Amino acid sequence: MEHELSGLFNVVHGAGLCALWGSWAAYVRPYHPKRFASFARQVMGIEEVNDDRCGTLGIQALVSFFKRVGMPVCITDLNVCIDEAIIQTMAQNCLLRSDSIGQLKRLSLQDIKAIYRKAGKVE
C-alpha cells in the first residue's frame, strides 16, 4: 500500500509507512487482538489485561512515538491530499497481481480503500 503512495506522490518510504501504519493497524487489530496485545506489551510496555484494549493502546503508543520523533501519522501530514479517485487508483494498483494483499489479514479492494480513507482523513 505504501509503494502506491510513494509512487504517486514521491513520498519517502519510511514516512509513508508511518503515515499508513496507524490506520492499517487499527483496521487489522480486531482480527488479531492477541497479536496486537503482545506487540503492545512486549514492544510498547503497555500493562493492560484486556487484549482488545491493550492492542488499541499499543497502536496509540506507537503513533504517539511517531509524532514525538517528527514522523507523519496520516497522509495529510505528508502534505498530500487524496480523494476517492486517487484512493480507487491506488487500491486497484495494489491488486494488479492478486485479488488481495497482506499476510496478517488478506486485504480486499474494499479493505484497502477503507485504510487509505482513514489514513487520508477522507470521509
Specify the residue positions occupied by each region the protein language model found:
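Active-site segments that bind and position negatively charged phosphate/pyrophosphate groups
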Residues: M1-A61
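C-terminal charged capping/lid subdomain of soluble metabolic enzymes
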Residues: F36, V43-E123
